[in-house]
Amino acid sequence: MIKVVPKVLVMSGYGINCETETAHTFQKAGAKTDIVHINDLIAGKKKMADYEIIMFPGGFSYGDDTGSGNAFANKIKNNLFDDLKEFINSGKLILGICNGFQVMTNLGLFALPSTDYGERISALEANTNNRYECRWVHIKENESICVFTKGIDIIHVPIAHGEGRFYCDEKTYLELKENKQIVFTYCDSEGNPANKEYPLNPNGAYYDIAGICDKSGRIMGLMPHPERSLYSISEPEYQLKKEIAKRNGEIIPEFIESNIQIFKNAVEYFNK
């Protein structure tokens, strides 16, 4: 059987700054990528319908003015939302990381069984300590319905945000939990819950939530950056792990497999 190579539309423009490493990671996972400025979509030079995956990368779109991800989301709502809903209804995939998660949250893309796309169900607010957090954390997959996380358990991954505290009301939380839409939660290195304790939970997120998906499992957003931790050499403990592996006659793999697996799963979705 001929392997399908999905095309990824990597959004760009106005303060987004992770498009290059995000495109690189998707390429390593087996996809083709185009980095596309939002104005080119609005002008009709590129079309969402020509792609299988839309990627909202990290960064600080519009300098986080009016709230992180809000201005960029409004630009999409005012110009491209019909195209985006058509893309969703066609059964394709959308992924958002950090600022991308914030944009998608403001767009209302994480629909519940009781809601429709365009209805906002949650927020990503200022970190509890009112500080920008830039370091590595552990997150655990929660046996969700998400297509991006097949075969993933615990991930060691960097964060870089000042507004990452997930919040929703209790009714929404219970529906997310019931429908297995809570994808990632903050934890310790063994997978034990952070229980909202700092520094395991870096931002005070409600129920330690680091990432969620929509009711179909095809749309996911998360605050941590797996695309920034593609290679083993990027890990803080790399030199120690390298020395231990050397003494044991082993070689450290090039990639952090759990992190690239998110992107491989997206590619494999179109080869089922």
From Swiss-Prot:
Q: What keywords would UniProt list here?
A: ATP-binding, Cytoplasm, Glutamine amidotransferase, Hydrolase, Ligase, Nucleotide-binding, Purine biosynthesis
Q: What is its main location?
A: cytoplasm
- GO molecular function, a single term: glutaminase activity
Gene Ontology CC terms: cytoplasm
The listed locations are: Cytoplasm
Active site per the UniProt annotation: C98 (nucleophile), H225, E227, E235
Biological pathway: Purine metabolism; IMP biosynthesis via de novo pathway; 5-amino-1-(5-phospho-D-ribosyl)imidazole from N(2)-formyl-N(1)-(5-phospho-D-ribosyl)glycinamide: step 1/2
Q: Which Pfam families does its entry note?
A: GATase_5
Q: Does the keyword Ligase apply?
A: yes
Q: Which InterPro entries match?
A: Class_I_gatase-like (IPR029062), PRibForGlyAmidine_synth_PurQ (IPR010075)
Asked whether the keyword Ligase is assigned, the reply is yes
Q: Which reaction does it catalyse?
A: N(2)-formyl-N(1)-(5-phospho-beta-D-ribosyl)glycinamide + L-glutamine + ATP + H2O = 2-formamido-N(1)-(5-O-phospho-beta-D-ribosyl)acetamidine + L-glutamate + ADP + phosphate + H(+); L-glutamine + H2O = L-glutamate + NH4(+)
What residue stretches are annotated with the Glutamine amidotransferase type-1 domain? 8-243
- Any one Gene Ontology BP term: 'de novo' IMP biosynthetic process
EC identifiers of the protein? 6.3.5.3, 3.5.1.2
Q: Subunit composition?
A: Part of the FGAM synthase complex composed of 1 PurL, 1 PurQ and 2 PurS subunits.
- Its function? Part of the phosphoribosylformylglycinamidine synthase complex involved in the purines biosynthetic pathway. Catalyzes the ATP-dependent conversion of formylglycinamide ribonucleotide (FGAR) and glutamine to yield formylglycinamidine ribonucleotide (FGAM) and glutamate. The FGAM synthase complex is composed of three subunits. PurQ produces an ammonia molecule by converting glutamine to glutamate. PurL transfers the ammonia molecule to FGAR to form FGAM in an ATP-dependent manner.
HAMAP family cross-referenced by the UniProt entry: PurQ
How is this protein named in the record?
Answer: Phosphoribosylformylglycinamidine synthase subunit PurQ
- Which species is listed as the source? Methanococcus maripaludis (strain C7 / ATCC BAA-1331)
Annotated gene: purQ
